[in-house]
């Protein structure tokens, strides 16, 4: 399994589109501008949904931008070759997406006033979503079974490393004024409330009609039908059975896939790894 990844500082990256030199540059040389907005997530946490919402907030609900420009051009992934190149050459405020753990992120961010949104999701759902997603790509070795992927996930031998370490790292910034923590589960339960929370954080005033447009065009169905957001433009050589980026978009799907023993094993690891956080920090627990 080890040879199927690009390893950097103990973190596994996909074997293509990720280079050691770029990852080093991001951490040590890349300068985050004060007007930049960062979308930070662990994979399969709802990154693209959050991106779509943020893009629509920027345009006050006008869908033209999201329907004409691919999502990876609107908010490039800084850790990819193409994304990094696009970001460093972009003038003005930048929307930047990243799955990087905190210790690999740009050092300049931590002394800047740039705003960042960190989106979290129940790691059990992330595990199941990741299993079905990565199995359809040629980016990593196919685990072959959920049981195998389950073990890899708990060990942190999956893309971008351990969920537990990723979350512990970024949550160390949760008290900072320029850092907003969101939960996928809250976004599903009260999407409009979450949109308002993001607007408040960004200092954007949207009227009721504009909020409704953001809600409408960021819906699961709207994104599924938008070729600029559903990743249908990805080259076929990267995927085996078509890239099912948007499989279900639900919460609690893990209950349909975990055995009782797996559920108990996961609970045990979660309690050990996430000890010390205040009660209520994780709404799914």
UniProtKB/Swiss-Prot annotation:
SUPFAM superfamilies: P-loop containing nucleoside triphosphate hydrolases (SSF52540). Disulfide bonds: none annotated. 3'-phosphoadenylyl sulfate binds at residues 44-49, 121, 129, 184, 218, 223, 247-249. Its EC number is 2.8.2.2. The active site is at residue 99. It catalyses: an alcohol + 3'-phosphoadenylyl sulfate = an alkyl sulfate + adenosine 3',5'-bisphosphate + H(+). GO terms for cellular component: cytoplasm. Pfam families: Sulfotransfer_1 (PF00685). It comes from the Eukaryota. It is found in: Cytoplasm. The keyword Lipid metabolism applies. GO terms for biological process: steroid metabolic process. The keyword Lipoprotein does not apply. Keywords: Cytoplasm, Lipid metabolism, Steroid metabolism, Transferase. It is an enzyme of class 2 (transferase). One of its GO terms (molecular function) is alcohol sulfotransferase activity. Signal peptide: none annotated. Belongs to the sulfotransferase 1 family. Sulfotransferase that utilizes 3'-phospho-5'-adenylyl sulfate (PAPS) as sulfonate donor to catalyze the sulfate conjugation of a potential wide variety of acceptor molecules bearing a hydroxyl group. Sulfonation increases the water solubility of most compounds, and therefore their renal excretion, but it can also result in bioactivation to form active metabolites. This is Sulfotransferase 2A2. The gene is Sult2a2.
């Amino acid at each position: 399994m080890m040879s199927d990844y690009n390893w950097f500082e103990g973190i596994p990256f996909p074997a293509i589109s990720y280079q050691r030199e770029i990852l080093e540059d991001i951490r040590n040389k890349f300068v985050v501008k004060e007007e930049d907005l960062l979308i930070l997530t662990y994979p399969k946490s709802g990154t693209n949904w959050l991106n779509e919402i943020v893009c629509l907030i920027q345009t006050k609900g006008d869908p033209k931008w999201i329907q004409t420009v691919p999502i990876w051009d609107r908010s490039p992934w800084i850790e990819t070759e193409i994304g990094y190149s696009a970001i460093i050459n972009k003038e003005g405020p930048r929307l930047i997406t990243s799955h990087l753990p905190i210790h690999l992120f740009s050092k300049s961010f931590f002394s800047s006033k740039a705003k960042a949104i960190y989106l979290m999701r129940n790691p059990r759902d992330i595990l199941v979503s990741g299993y079905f997603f990565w199995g359809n790509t040629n980016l990593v070795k196919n685990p072959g079974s959920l049981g195998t992927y389950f073990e890899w996930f708990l060990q942190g031998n999956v893309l971008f490393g351990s969920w537990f370490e990723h979350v512990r790292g970024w949550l160390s910034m949760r008290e900072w004024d320029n850092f907003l923590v969101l939960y996928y589960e809250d976004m599903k339960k009260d999407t409009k409330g979450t949109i308002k929370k993001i607007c408040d954080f960004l200092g954007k005033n949207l009227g009721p009609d504009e909020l409704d447009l953001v809600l409408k065009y960021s819906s699961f169905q709207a994104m599924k039908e938008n070729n600029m957001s559903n990743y249908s433009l990805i080259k076929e050589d990267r995927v085996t059975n078509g890239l099912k980026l948007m499989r279900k978009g639900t919460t609690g799907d893990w209950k349909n896939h975990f055995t009782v023993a797996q559920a108990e094993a996961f609970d045990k690891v979660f309690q050990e790894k996430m000890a010390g956080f205040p009660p209520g920090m994780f709404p799914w627990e």
